[in-house]
């Protein structure tokens, strides 16, 4: 008689199972939060230093040379000489309106990406890193062309914040990316990306007034303002018109592009409500598969998440048996990627993964490994022993799990041990960012 193995505990056991190997420890989470706080505090301080210089210029007309000298005594000194001159020049040349806007500017912060979605996995291979994306948000008047406060000044001040911390911490490195500044800490297998956004000041202030009125009821945290070391935050109060959230670009003619990360966050939260809490787990497992198959590269996390949501929205599955659910996902992923994976954010100009007629070597490599995944899972399911089953399934997810006792003989169960998750039509993402 042919044996069939059940892998639910292999996937879900919080100690020895795959889930237990992927979830960050409390220490790792706290280290990321501490790093985030250090950067936020330094960013706030650098902006206060720059505003102090601008205030001195307003009070008594200072020469360019004096402004340069003042810049060199702040954390901005960690920029290059030419960048310091540029900061001094931009402050010196501000007109009265721009200076007043700058003096009233206080950066806000909002974490985005896998840390926020609770799908961040521990690194597996050398070179892979834990990452946290923490946006710096600048409440500014809505602009049609260029804002009063120059794009270059804002970028340079955020860079100065990061570079000053790099100068103070051995082993930290700064990297300039097109859409963010990055601090990389190789010894801790960690990096933090700091993108910068402009958001509409008037709308933000109205929301903040509402937040202040309800401060006693606020528990969660999305936007966080370190004013007197306080944290203010509320996912609904800080909903903003996505059309007016603009991401700063470092290079090129386009200085800003419309991009609101909360669209994707809301989409994923809504998907978890609609499909079930197991969605976060299977998305973690697919990212674990990716990290085991490629030391760098492979399909993006968001493309795996979007394809997985599409599958679980349309195929009935048993949330109480994630081994079977993963087989369903693996079976349908190749066709999802072959037709192309669209972004849940309608403002994205490109698909997350192109359709098959546009595939090059990279895409063909990804398709080949996607097509191999269901074969691996099927082979593991029909292995001759637990140890052989473990060896085979680890071909997909790496040798993270070593306890073969988590793999048990499949019992003769009805088609579904509980009512299957209903397959509903995927919901259209609202551009107005309704929180899930």
UniProtKB/Swiss-Prot annotation:
Residue positions binding ATP: 182, 259
Cofactor binding note from Swiss-Prot or TrEMBL: Binds 1 Mg(2+) ion per subunit.
Binding sites annotated in the UniProt record for Mg(2+): 131, 133, 193
Enzyme Commission no: 2.7.7.-
Catalysed reactions listed for this entry: GTP + ATP = 3',3'-cGAMP + 2 diphosphate
Region feature Disordered, mapped onto this chain: 339-358, 417-436
Disruption phenotype: Cells lacking this gene show a significant defects in intestinal colonization.
Impact reported for residue 109 to P: Abolishes enzyme activity
Cofactor list: Mg(2+)
Reported effect, residue 434 to E: DncV-GFP fusion cleaved by Cap3
Effect of residue 436 to A: Loss of defense against phage T2, T5, T6 but not P1
Identification of the protein by name: Cyclic GMP-AMP synthase
Induction: Expression is repressed by the transcriptional regulator VspR. Part of a CBASS operon consisting of capV-dncV-cap2-cap3.
UniProt keyword terms in alphabetical order: Antiviral defense, ATP-binding, GTP-binding, Isopeptide bond, Magnesium, Metal-binding, Nucleotide metabolism, Nucleotide-binding, Nucleotidyltransferase, Transferase, Virulence
């Amino acid at each position: 008689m042919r044996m069939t193995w059940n892998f639910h505990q292999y996937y879900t056991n919080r100690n020895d199972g795959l889930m237990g190997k992927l979830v960050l420890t409390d220490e790792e989470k706290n280290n990321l939060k501490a790093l985030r706080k250090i950067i936020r505090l330094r960013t706030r301080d650098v902006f206060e230093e720059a505003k102090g210089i601008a205030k001195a210029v307003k009070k008594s007309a200072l020469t360019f040379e004096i402004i340069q000298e003042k810049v060199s005594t702040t954390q901005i000194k960690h920029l290059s000489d030419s960048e310091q001159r540029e900061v001094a020049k931009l402050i010196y040349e501000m007109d009265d309106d721009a200076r007043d806007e700058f003096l009233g500017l206080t950066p806000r912060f909002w974490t985005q990406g896998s840390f926020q979605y609770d799908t961040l996995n521990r690194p597996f291979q050398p070179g892979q890193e834990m990452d946290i994306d923490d946006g710096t948000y600048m409440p500014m008047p809505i602009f049609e062309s260029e804002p009063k406060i120059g794009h270059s000044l804002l970028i340079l001040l955020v860079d100065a914040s990061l570079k000053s911390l790099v100068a103070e911490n051995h082993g930290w490195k700064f990297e300039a990316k097109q859409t963010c500044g990055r601090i990389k800490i190789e010894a801790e297998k960690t990096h933090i990306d700091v993108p910068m956004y402009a958001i509409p000041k008037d709308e933000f202030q109205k929301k903040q007034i509402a937040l202040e009125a309800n401060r006693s009821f606020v528990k969660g945290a999305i936007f966080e303002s370190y004013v007197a070391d306080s944290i203010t935050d509320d996912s609904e109060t800080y909903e903003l018109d996505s059309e007016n959230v603009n991401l700063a670009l470092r290079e090129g003619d386009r200085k800003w592009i419309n991009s609101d990360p909360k669209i994707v966050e809301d989409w994923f939260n809504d998907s978890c409500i609609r499909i079930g809490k197991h969605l976060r787990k299977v998305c973690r497992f697919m990212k674990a598969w990716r990290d085991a198959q490629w030391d760098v590269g492979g399909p993006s996390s968001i493309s795996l998440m979007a394809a997985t949501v599409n599958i679980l929205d349309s195929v009935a599955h048993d949330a109480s048996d994630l081994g079977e659910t993963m087989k369903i996902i693996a079976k349908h992923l190749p066709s999802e990627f072959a037709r192309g994976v669209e972004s849940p954010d309608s403002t994205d100009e490109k698909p997350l993964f192109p359709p098959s007629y546009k595939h090059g070597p990279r895409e063909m490599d990804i398709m080949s490994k996607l097509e191999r995944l269901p074969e691996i899972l099927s082979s593991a399911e029909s292995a001759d022993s637990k140890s052989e089953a473990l060896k085979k399934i680890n071909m997909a997810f790496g040798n993270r799990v070593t306890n073969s006792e988590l793999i048990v003989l499949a019992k003769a169960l009805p088609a579904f041990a509980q009512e299957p998750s209903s397959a509903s039509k995927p919901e259209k993402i609202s551009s107005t960012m309704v929180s899930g």
